Design a protein with these regions (language model features):
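Amphipathic coiled-coil signal-relay and dimerization helices
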Residues: 143-145, 288-292
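Acidic, low-complexity proline/glycine-rich segments
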Residues: 20-33
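A short, sequence-level motif marking secondary-structure junctions
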Residues: 46, 148-149, 158, 293-296
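A general secondary-structure signal for short beta-strands and their flanking turns/coil
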Residues: 27, 36-38, 148, 194
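Generic N-terminal amphipathic, Lys/Arg-enriched alpha-helix
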Residues: 34-47
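Generic recognition of flexible, low-complexity loop/linker segments
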Residues: 28-29, 186, 267
């Protein structure tokens, strides 16, 4: 059941929109939801520290959707048009997308899901003594990992999968504080055909933007791939009249390999520039690993794995 956090009822009287809901799940995690934003939040620490951290997360979430809505038109513009934002989460989106804009078409909306997670996590852990914490927004995850700690994040071989079929272990020393997954059949539209591209980066917003762009480039021209204009599927899409993937038919192993190689080149470019820490690219059970992250992979349903230079699910 959804209820308000202790000491702060969700009501119009304290400036909180009536649609904002919050409550503790049976396992002690915090659930925050407002409109399309649905967060699952967990942390490890002393009970009083966790209570305060969760209250701070609630405060950080309150009003965030409304601030984004006010900036939506600007944040839907390409980075090259120099979009502006009046809120912190919008600034995170712009900063994340700007890292990739020199060679790629990208709007700040590419980082919206986990810019929200980054923002809530930042507020949540401020002045709090927690060993580990995370904010999961639809499988894209912002992480807080104290020195000497590590976290395990569930990952999926297809973005629409409901249950993780693999896991990656992330230590504090790696510097990865964000995990994001993108693919053609997920809730966001894609220009490519990747089943899943999972990226580790220094922030969740950077991981989200990078995963989107790498997944776009896992692609090839083929009659089995169906596409449509983005704005014909979603009115006002930030992708405009770009062709997005709507269906992927049967491909040979060589064709899948060709598509993965294209995305791998983009991932390597991002790795070399320092924009990401590593990436896992999957299509039809073939996988490519970019960066020194093979040791992080606990398991995954893939074959023909190669290494150069999520929907996430569970987090432990």
């Amino acid at each position: 059941m959804i209820s308000s956090p202790p000491d702060q009822p969700a009501s119009p009287g304290n400036g909180t929109p009536q649609t904002l809901q919050a409550g503790l799940l049976k396992d002690g995690r915090l659930h925050l939801q407002n409109g399309p934003i649905d967060l699952i939040i967990g942390a490890l620490g002393e009970p009083e520290e966790l209570r305060k951290a969760y209250m701070q997360a609630y405060d950080g979430f309150d009003g965030l959707l409304e601030a984004l809505a006010d900036d939506f038109e600007s944040l839907s513009r390409p980075i090259t048009s120099e979009p502006k934002s009046k809120c912190g989460v919008g600034d995170r989106m712009i900063n994340a997308a700007s890292r990739f804009s020199e060679e790629h078409f990208v709007t700040p909306m590419a980082a919206v899901a986990v810019a929200v997670a980054d923002t809530v996590l930042s507020v949540m852990v401020t002045s709090r003594r927690v060993k580990r914490a995370y904010v999961n927004n639809g499988g894209d995850i912002a992480l807080h990992i104290a020195e000497g700690e590590e976290m395990t994040v569930g990952v999926v071989p297809q973005v629409e999968a409901l249950v993780p079929q693999g896991a990656i272990k992330i230590s504090a020393s790696m510097g990865a504080r964000g995990v994001a997954t993108s693919g053609w059949s997920g809730r966001s539209m894609s220009l490519g055909i990747a089943d899943a591209v999972t990226v580790l980066a220094e922030s969740a917003a950077a991981a989200d933007a990078a995963a989107t762009l790498i997944a776009n480039d896992v692609d090839l021209e083929h009659p089995a791939i169906e596409r449509a204009r983005a704005n014909s599927l979603v009115e006002g899409s930030d992708l405009g009249d770009l062709l997005v993937t709507t269906a992927v038919g049967s491909l040979t192993e060589n064709e899948v390999s060709e598509a993965l190689a294209s995305g791998e080149e983009t991932a390597q470019e991002f790795l070399d520039s320092g924009a990401i820490i590593g990436a896992f690219l999957i299509k039809d059970r073939q996988m490519r690993i970019v960066g020194d992250v093979r040791h992080c992979l606990q398991s995954m349903a893939g074959k023909n794995q190669e290494s150069r230079g999520n929907g996430g699910g569970f987090v432990q």
